[in-house]
Curated annotation (Swiss-Prot):
The gene is abcC1. Residues 470-690, 1116-1350 form the ABC transporter domain. This is ABC transporter C family member 1. It comes from Dictyostelium discoideum. InterPro entries: AAA+_ATPase, ABC1_TM_dom, ABC1_TM_sf, ABC_transporter-like_ATP-bd, ABC_transporter-like_CS, ABC_transporter_C-like, ABCC_6TM_D1, ABCC_6TM_D2. The lineage of its organism: Eukaryota, Amoebozoa, Evosea, Eumycetozoa, Dictyostelia. Belongs to the ABC transporter superfamily. ABCC family. Conjugate transporter (TC 3.A.1.208) subfamily.
Amino acid sequence: MLKNLRNKIKEKLTYSLLSSQEFDNNKDYYQQPCPEDNANLWSRLTFGWAQRMLISGYFNGPLEMSDINDLPKDIKVQSSIQLLNNINLNKNNNSRWPLIKHFYKQFLYRNKLTIFLQILTNILSILSPLSLKYFIQFIQSTNKERSFLAGIGYCILLLIASFSYTFSQQLLMWFAMKSSLEIKGCLSIKVYEKTLKLTTCGGKNYNPGSIMNLLSVDVGIISNFFWIEHMGIFAFSSQMIGLLALLCWVIGWSGLVGFAIMVITFPINTYIGSKIGKNLKESMGYSDKRTNLTSEFINGIRFLKMYAWEKLFLDRIEEQRSLQLKYLYKRMIFWIFAEMMKQAVNAIVLVLTFIVYSINNEITLEVAFTTISIFVSLRIPLLRLPNSIQQLQSLIPIAKRVEDFLKSPEIQQNHSSNREEEEEDEYDDDINSDGDISIHNGSFNWNQVDSNGSGNGNGNQQQQQQQQQQQQQQQQQQQQQSYTLNNINFKAPAGKLTIICGVVGSGKTSLVSGLIGEIYKVSGRVNTPNKISFTTQQSFLLSTSLRENILFGNEMNLERYKKVIEACCLAPDLLQLAAKDLTEIGERGINLSGGQKQRISLARALYANSDCYILDEPLSAVDPEVATHLFNHCIQGMMNDKTRILITHQLQFIPSADHIVVVDNGKLVQGTYSELKSKGIDFESIMKTKKLNIDNQQQQQQHEKENDIVLSDEDSNNSIKNNNNISNLIDIDEVISDENDSNLIERSKLLVDEDRNEGSVNLRVYKEYFKHGSSIPLFIMTCIVYMISQIIYQMSDFWLSTWSQRSIPDKTDKYYISIYLLFIVGFIIFLVIRYFMMAHVTFSASKNLHQSLLKSVGFASCQFFDTNPSGRILNRFSKDISDVDLLLFDLFSDVLYCGSTVLVSIGIMIYISPLIIIPFLLLIGIYYFIQRLYTESSRELKRLEAISRSPIFSLLQESFNGLVTIRSYKQQNKFISMMQDRINTNHRLSYYGFSVHRWVAVRLEFISSIVVFLAAFFSLFNSNAGFSVLSVTTALGMCSYLNWTVRQMVELEVKMNSVERIESYLNIPKEGNSKINFFRNEQQEEEEEEEEEFDFDNDDYDGFKLSKKWLTKGEIEFRNVEIKYGHSGESSLKNFTLKINQKDHIGIVGRTGAGKSTIGNGLFRMVECSKGSILIDGVDISKIGLHELRSSLGIVPQDPFIFSGTIRLNIDPFNKYTDSEIWVALEKVKLKSTISSMPLKLETMIEEGGDGLSFGQKQLLCLSRTILKNSKVVLMDEATSGIDYVTSDLIKQTINNCFKNCTMLTIAHRLDTIIDSTKIAVIDKGKLIEYDTPNNLIENQESRFSKLVKHHHNLFKEK
């Protein structure tokens, strides 16, 4: 029955509200144009075009994206970007606040209608006090002079005066909101475009965390200012002048007393505003640092867990958070003082005005309540003008942060010349006559930036010429400067294979970076083709399907795609994936092995069909068999007719090169293999010495033949020719999935959809919030104090009514003034108390929520990070925490302040006119229905808007990580288009969220105006003129609060979504057992060292005790271990059994994806065993605390993890070792000379990711950590894959010496690094297929290892 009634109401409402508009529950509105575009004038004025969404959201359940229409074209980012087309942010622009000034100019030029509405609103603000003045005159007139029809006319006049003012306000806010969205859109996309242009040097000051703060916080503050506050200083000033003139007309010059007080308080408010802005700026700076560290923490979470360094990073983040909170607290204190000033000034102005007026005049009803009405109207500009000044002062540092980012160094423009430009160039000579890639007299420097490339404006030519002259002068002065690459000449013949080789840190990556424009070109000339494919040493992958990562924005060519899959040897890997090539790849390829990631990058380059391929170590992470296949079928196969530049340490391929470039300490020697040998350059000696003496090449003629690992040209070529296609037994069609298969697509998903709660925010969320904010009783007391303060304030008006009528005989004005002052003082006292109580609650909640969130995420399982993109997680720490920090205090204060004001006002009106409760009940019913209609839709729109932010941040994170790849493929426009779509989606939800609010505001304001009419109407029948006027005045004052209460209640619920989203992360799955030793202080550790045994501080261990002398041997045993990633899918290790004796050095080999790295993940419990167990020294590691386990093991990971901080901090984060011990470790890994040559040595700062260090140097730095740690069990996961053979040979000696008393597991594709191992374990498809000594395995001609060795240049024979 109720359901039928609901449907009937729905049908009636749909018909009445939508009129002739078509309403279809099943229609997809996502692609439909904005209904405002085709709405008639009435619908535009009343926002009736937004009704469909309101009805759909209320009757059809939660709104979905299919219910949301498209944006108007002028609001889309593609249009709004024009706002910043002509801005000049050049470094030589000395204008102050260029961004703010530019937006003001654009606003004045583009928003004349908004300016007109602001003027109209100011004029209409005078109408209500005037109407009240004439109504009071009518009420005070004798019964003979009063006409009932005239009274009705005055009531209608009050209704019109009230509604016209608020109605014009709604239209004003709507058009201002459109401008705000345009500004937000153009700034957001400009920040993203700038991100894609950042140089390596420019990027050092910014990382995804700080840029995300710019997008989520700074841009939002700027756009909000230009929505509400941008006209405040001018509009509220003019409104105050108009109302002040009216006040002087009513009470004479006494009105100037109040004005004088306001003028006096302006400097105080300005000073407080400046303090608020200053503290906000400081807090934002620490917020950036905190977000940067959090971003770094999330990106490196796997490494941090393996190193057991979570505590280190959590402490660093908390340190920045504490500093941020320090300034947020100061800001809050100043904010409270500002609010106290505003509220107190309102009251004091009224008191002093009446005191001065009463000296020579008698306070009458007309004077008293017309003055009150004027001051009620003045209350908005009185409150908002200081707030606008304060907001402008706060905006200046925020805008400066955005300006500084937009001015940061960009990638160098005109870095290289293409072939068409070469023909007309003055340097055109035989260097590039055949279309070769070349560098002519080139000098490059990582630390220098392009001064002309920074900024986004169109600076004038004179400024640019001056900059160029200054740059030339600097270059002349720095001729003696040592560049990264100085005055080099390089040539890669067109259509040929050029191989670049050299020792670690010699400048190989810098050389190719010079070709693609990633390093600043100081001088010289670079010639490159138009289309280049570049693969980085650390692969860049998007969080999308494997297929999309290969296509990378190009159209699908099925035949070429199949050939690419075959050439890159991906077919066997794809067969093992759930959805084949449609399998979703996690962020940074977390569900792939290193070799698989490199081959996908190589496939992307190959599919692009470019003119030139630059490949930086694409063969280092694959086994010899796959490396040979890639070289034969990809580099020398499908790429054969293209120019190829290959950086590699794989010596077996060097004789096959058409051109070879040897790089040593920034110097180049180049030629064919035979030419270099004739010059005395022999690759045997290159790999046997740390540094080449290029100037004495002719003297290097003798080589140590016993260590010769290079094949002759003929042998090498034969080896490659004899290699068979290792994927020729696989039907390529089997690995290409049907993208229309919904079941397959579902299985391919790795990332989980973001949680979205439906309906109102659960009461539990509020309870949890207040529990984090001290206590629930404290909040209840705060609510009571708010109510008491507003009752006292309203009683002052009640007393004024008594005063104006002299209701108490024989009392002088002094008596009335004293009581009135008592009310005002009481109000101010309770005002201070309520604000400080609310500040304590919200500040404590903010502090504790972040602490709980950080702890929860820090201890989360790895699966959580695998299935949630980092941008989504970081969104909790940036936008959601920012909302909790900056908005909830204001919102709770507003709701309690406005809500208590409305309740007290209604109580007064019912007390004065009891009969008014009858129409009130009807209006309350209508009011409640409209409010629910609005709340259901607005809340879901806000939730969708919050969810739509995560894809923006995820794309930003991925783009920043892949800047070099995106730029080398010239895919900036594609990524900008992707970001535009995501911003438009986010703004679409904001736009319709604003529209439904304007819809409800117009209707609630009309109801408020009816309340004014009813209060005036019932006052016609009241014999007490004072009470009658008080009722009408109270109704007029309540109008502005009623709609604001509803708006702020919904806004509060929306922002509580941030709390809800944070709390959803407080209960995420944690890793196995708790981490003992984690929160113990040094004294506890010393006490425990004196004991023979210690207990785990966790109930899960059931009294299990771990011997203090655990892990003294290093024996490892895998017993029938089975490990799988996630709850579904194939196991990565299957019935895996392996026993390793103490001090054994075990080499682990197998093709990529065989399960080698899973052994390490299982050992460190990065993933738990689904079956079986792993024992170390006889103890099942599943019973050992994770921190205890991981801190006892050593690891050198495949992808080196370098975090921001000093070199010392990266090597010894807990400050356990002396300088001499650190230097010894660095000397052992051959980094001592490199580090000691740096000006600050161990205190040299390194940026996140180790910018400034080569890939090999990063690996060596990680190795130095493990050497210092001196663990009994060490895992080496491709630890030397990025290191040349000579350094690798020296490091191998170091490893053998340093870890001779350790049990070591070495995962490697370069067999020379494991040939001396005690035993070799061969893994295939998650199973142990061979396990024996290297001698025994090689002597067995049928063994897999023996065949691998043959593919690796017969290394064993040379032993």
